[in-house]
Amino acid sequence: MSPELEKVIHDLTLRMLLIRAIQEGDSPSSLTEREALILQQLLERPQMTISEIAESWPNVSESTISMTITRLWREKAYVSKIIKPDNQRVTLVQITDKGKTAIQKHLAQQAERYNTLFQAINATPEEKEMLIRICRRGIEYLDTHLAQMQKPTAKP
């Protein structure tokens, strides 16, 4: 990556994060990135074990994921925990209606920030189409990379 492109991406990311921080402030209902991603996982799969959720986070310990889920459960009531009936050693996590509302609001705010940006820069239809193609290629690469990261490593 060229130094200029690296700087532009860094600067854009920083400014988007600053705007998010200013808009959300220290609201107790605001979500960290990890909380938001866990809630998105639970939207896709309504019941998951903590281990299943943690599998998506190869460089994050299961205890860190467990602490995040506990915060979503105790402090925010965005998830509920259920003991699995056929194996009482396993706890299932599911998103609550309050959690669904929170993640939908979070995603809507995120979309609004990008919409505001794209309207402000007055991109032409061709530029928007090019950006879509570039983003899709990036998503394709990242999906492949994530799949590789999540594969269990063979133990000697």
Give residue ranges: language-model regions.
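A structural signal for well-ordered alpha-helices, especially hydrophobic packing surfaces
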Residues: 13-16, 20, 76, 139-143
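N-terminal leader segment of winged-helix/HTH proteins
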Residues: 1-33
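Terminal interaction helix/tail motif
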Residues: 108, 112-156
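Charged, amphipathic alpha-helical coiled-coil/dimerization segments
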Residues: 73-129
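Residues within the DNA-recognition helix of helix-turn-helix
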Residues: 68-71
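N-terminal helix-turn-helix DNA-binding core of bacterial DNA-binding proteins
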Residues: 21-64
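Amphipathic alpha-helical interaction segments
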Residues: 7, 11, 37, 130-137
